A protein has these predicted regions:
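Conserved polymerase palm-domain catalytic core
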Residues: 20-23, 27-28, 32-39, 77-81, ...
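Conserved pre-motif C helix in the palm subdomain of viral-like polymerases
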Residues: 49-78, 161-171
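Alpha-helical hydrophobic packing sites
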Residues: 5-7, 52, 116, 168
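Residues at alpha-helix boundaries and the short loops/turns that link adjacent helices
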Residues: 15, 60, 72-73, 121, ...
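Short coil/turn segments at secondary-structure boundaries
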Residues: 8-15, 29, 49-61, 82-89
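Non-catalytic, polymerase-adjacent accessory regions of viral genome-replication enzymes
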Residues: 1-21
């Protein structure tokens, strides 16, 4: 899916690995993400729509680089039975854990919590502080993450909170 620049992965497939790496390096030297394209998709089981923020392809590549650095550092520090938005964990694993708890410990209580608009209201400062607490101390990287969080949303302006769903470092 194209971002605001109209480019997709097809537009950069012809570049050599060296050209891609050099372009990413140049962009990271003084990183300024392009604006994010707003797209609305249907929410399952509802008439409402979920807003997605679609970054430009080069910004997605940079986010992928960041994800590949952050994930192996942060993931081992997360609770072992946390299943949302984690690699190799899904709803089936969560259900299996619940069934196991019911069978082993006879726990029959379940709480279903859905925090309305959670990702749209994440405090940027608190998120960056949490990333610091998890051991990410590189100030340049934290600055880049901050810029990504504050990427202009086409037609809406610069957000002061929230993580635009649709990027690689967002849910």
């Amino acid at each position: 899916t194209a971002g605001t620049d109209g480019k997709t992965i097809e537009d950069i497939k012809g570049l050599s690995d060296r050209e891609v790496i050099e372009t990413v390096r140049k962009q990271l030297a003084d990183y300024h993400p392009q604006s994010v394209r707003r797209v609305f998709i249907p929410k399952p089981g509802s008439d409402k729509k979920r807003p997605l923020g679609i970054p430009c392809i080069w910004d997605r590549l940079i986010q992928q680089c960041i994800l590949q650095v952050l994930e192996p550092i942060c993931d081992p520090k997360f609770h072992n039975h946390s299943y949302g938005f984690r690699q190799n964990r899904d709803a089936h694993h969560a259900v299996s854990r619940v069934v196991s708890m019911v069978n082993m410990y006879k726990h029959y209580y379940c709480v279903d919590v859905d925090i309305k608009g959670f990702f749209d209201n994440v405090n940027h400062g608190k998120l960056l502080k949490q990333i610091w607490t998890l051991g990410i101390r590189d100030k340049r990287l934290l600055c880049i993450i901050s810029k990504i969080l504050k990427s202009e949303i086409e037609g809406e302006g610069i957000p002061d909170k929230g993580t635009p769903q649709g990027g690689l470092i967002s849910p």
